[in-house]
């Protein structure tokens, strides 16, 4: 575990190169050819997946179970986790699941939240930044795809922002909602309403995918073709 301060002049523990999957070195065809069939799970075409989620666990056990299942799915596919750096709630659940499975965890957290979202030992490598804006930008830069578990205002803002970035052509990375027990039905209904009323182009309804469980969602992310 290594914590970098925003005042640290040189951070060597984490590779700063963008986590971009190029057509030349990590194409879908190569990923399929290099499929890891252990447990019937294919190795992913992603190096790192960013997970947005709550610093609370929610009232349903299914939310925590989904976070753990997602972490195990990433480990099975040999995908690193990028997340908000906290040890509480669903953030802690998914990070612990990845670390306990032998996967690599990269957390990005503002200095002001260290005392609020971290208790005890941090999970994996922690990159400490100066602001929420830096946190979101760094998480996005390091990731090849995005997943939103259930969460509150912060989670909703984070996932909607990366969908908006896709709409603006800022990135072409897959975005997925892990719709546990219909948690994101309201957001799906909102998007359908916005499309019907002319605020979102029909083609942009497909800027993200959703599924009720981690294996199904990750499969959709793997198959995603940018709009």
Swiss-Prot record:
One Gene Ontology CC term in the entry: nucleus
Keywords of this entry: Cytokinin biosynthesis, Hydrolase
Gene Ontology terms for molecular function: cytokinin riboside 5'-monophosphate phosphoribohydrolase activity
Main function: Cytokinin-activating enzyme working in the direct activation pathway. Phosphoribohydrolase that converts inactive cytokinin nucleotides to the biologically active free-base forms.
Lineage: Eukaryota, Viridiplantae, Streptophyta, Embryophyta, Tracheophyta
Domain of life: Eukaryota
Region (Disordered): 1-26
Protein name per its UniProtKB record: Probable cytokinin riboside 5'-monophosphate phosphoribohydrolase LOGL9
Class of the enzyme per the UniProt entry, highest EC level: hydrolase
Species, as recorded: Oryza sativa subsp. japonica
Membrane-traversing stretches: none
Tissues showing expression: Expressed in roots, leaves and stems.
Biased composition (Polar residues): 1-15
GO BP annotation list: cytokinin biosynthetic process
PANTHER family given in the database record: CYTOKININ RIBOSIDE 5'-MONOPHOSPHATE PHOSPHORIBOHYDROLASE LOG5 (PTHR31223:SF14), LOG FAMILY PROTEIN YJL055W (PTHR31223)
Family listed: Belongs to the LOG family.
Binding site for substrate: 117, 135-136, 152-158
Record SUPFAM superfamilies: MCP/YpsA-like
EC number annotated for this UniProt entry: 3.2.2.n1
Catalytic activity: N(6)-(dimethylallyl)adenosine 5'-phosphate + H2O = N(6)-dimethylallyladenine + D-ribose 5-phosphate; 9-ribosyl-trans-zeatin 5'-phosphate + H2O = trans-zeatin + D-ribose 5-phosphate
